Amino acid sequence: MDQAKLARMQASVRIDKSATNPINRGKGTPRRKVKKVHKSSGADDKKLQTTLKKMNVQPIQAIEEVNMFKEDGNVIHFAAPKVHASVPSNTFALYGNGEEKELTELVPGILNQLGPDSLASLRKLAESYQNMQKSQAGAEGKKDEDEDDIPDLVEGENFESNVE
């Protein structure tokens, strides 16, 4: 048997008869680690499917992408999702991998999909983005002005004599 494997097995055993390790000595059988079995998400999907069947959802075909706009300006983008809907219960279910993207990444492709309220929110977002850019540029400008008053340190020169 491999010596390293034997040493690992001895270290994992609770009963140790050596006098050098009095902490682990004791009677009884060693405790064994319980292997935890994690539930797979497949069980959750099955429960969800049965609940949706009770609501009598119907699949909607030919949906290429779904975009969900968040308040912070980001978009949750689903490419080729599976969509099920139940109009009487006003319920829609989306299946697929959603990616969180910035609105600027999707702008050219989604302009024709936006409604009037989304266009208004897009304008507000563009204005806030421009204001943020201006404020950052203004902060950098103030930073540069403050740095003009501070002379650069050059090796061999003494600026304290100029102050006096």
UniProtKB/Swiss-Prot annotation:
<dbReference type="GO" id="GO:0015031">
    <property type="term" value="P:protein transport"/>
</dbReference>
<feature type="region of interest" description="Disordered">
    <location>
        <begin position="130"/>
        <end position="164"/>
    </location>
</feature>
<keyword id="KW-0813">Transport</keyword>
<dbReference type="Pfam" id="PF01849">
    <property type="entry name" value="NAC"/>
</dbReference>
<feature type="domain" description="NAC-A/B">
    <location>
        <begin position="42"/>
        <end position="107"/>
    </location>
</feature>
<keyword id="KW-0653">Protein transport</keyword>
<dbReference type="InterPro" id="IPR002715">
    <property type="entry name" value="Nas_poly-pep-assoc_cplx_dom"/>
</dbReference>
<keyword id="KW-0805">Transcription regulation</keyword>
<keyword id="KW-0963">Cytoplasm</keyword>
<comment type="subunit">
    <text>Part of the nascent polypeptide-associated complex (NAC), consisting of egd2 and egd1. NAC associates with ribosomes via egd1.</text>
</comment>
<dbReference type="GO" id="GO:0005854">
    <property type="term" value="C:nascent polypeptide-associated complex"/>
</dbReference>
<keyword id="KW-0539">Nucleus</keyword>
<dbReference type="InterPro" id="IPR039370">
    <property type="entry name" value="BTF3"/>
</dbReference>
<feature type="compositionally biased region" description="Acidic residues">
    <location>
        <begin position="145"/>
        <end position="164"/>
    </location>
</feature>
<feature type="compositionally biased region" description="Basic residues">
    <location>
        <begin position="28"/>
        <end position="39"/>
    </location>
</feature>
<keyword id="KW-0804">Transcription</keyword>
<dbReference type="InterPro" id="IPR038187">
    <property type="entry name" value="NAC_A/B_dom_sf"/>
</dbReference>
<dbReference type="GO" id="GO:0005634">
    <property type="term" value="C:nucleus"/>
</dbReference>
<feature type="region of interest" description="Disordered">
    <location>
        <begin position="1"/>
        <end position="45"/>
    </location>
</feature>
<comment type="function">
    <text>Component of the nascent polypeptide-associated complex (NAC), a dynamic component of the ribosomal exit tunnel, protecting the emerging polypeptides from interaction with other cytoplasmic proteins to ensure appropriate nascent protein targeting. The NAC complex also promotes mitochondrial protein import by enhancing productive ribosome interactions with the outer mitochondrial membrane and blocks the inappropriate interaction of ribosomes translating non-secretory nascent polypeptides with translocation sites in the membrane of the endoplasmic reticulum.</text>
</comment>
<comment type="similarity">
    <text>Belongs to the NAC-beta family.</text>
</comment>
<protein>
    <recommendedName>
        <fullName>Nascent polypeptide-associated complex subunit beta</fullName>
    </recommendedName>
</protein>
<keyword id="KW-0678">Repressor</keyword>
